[in-house]
Amino acid sequence: MKKKAAWIPWLTGLCMSTALMAAIFLFGDLKYAMNDDTAILRQYMGFGTGAIPEAHAFLHPLLSTPLRWLGLAAPEVPWFSWMQLALLWLACMVSVKALMQCFAKRGFSMALGAAAGAGYLTLFGMTYACHVTFTA
């Protein structure tokens, strides 16, 4: 792959990942796959005790600390859900980029890699994006 074309996999991954998330938001039914996620979401919105926890047993401090700050600033926003969706969007984008680069490195066209990325997002990425879970 030429240096000039290095941005093409990133842009393609960005567009495909954004299109996937837009399609899910428009036509899909986003829900939590496990009840653990709902409990975490509610705790970081202040349900139950009325206080937002400083730490959570299931979350790494690098995730729980910003969630606490965001929850204190605007508790009505489901920050845990938005964080999960943003990380899924990023993972889908990087997956498409990696597939395109692998195809290009082996002498195939990037368009074939983009088609493989679209298939990957359709068959695997959509499942995790529709049934959000922190354990996936």
How would you label these PLM feature ranges?
Residues 9-56, 68-72:
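Extracytoplasmic loop-helix module adjacent to an early transmembrane segment
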Residues 45, 94, 135-136:
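Specific aromatic-rich, kink-prone transmembrane helix
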Residues 53-78, 82-86:
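Short hydrophobic/aromatic helix or loop-helix immediately within or flanking a transmembrane segment
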Residues 1-15, 107-108:
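N-terminal membrane topogenic signal
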Residues 64-68, 93-94, 114-122:
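Hydrophobic, membrane-inserted alpha-helices
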Residues 99-121:
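Transmembrane-helix signature of polytopic, membrane-embedded enzymes
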Residues 114-136:
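Aromatic- and kink-enriched transmembrane "portal" helix at the membrane-lumen/periplasm boundary
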Residues 86-106:
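Transmembrane-helix motifs of polytopic, lipid-linked glycan transferases
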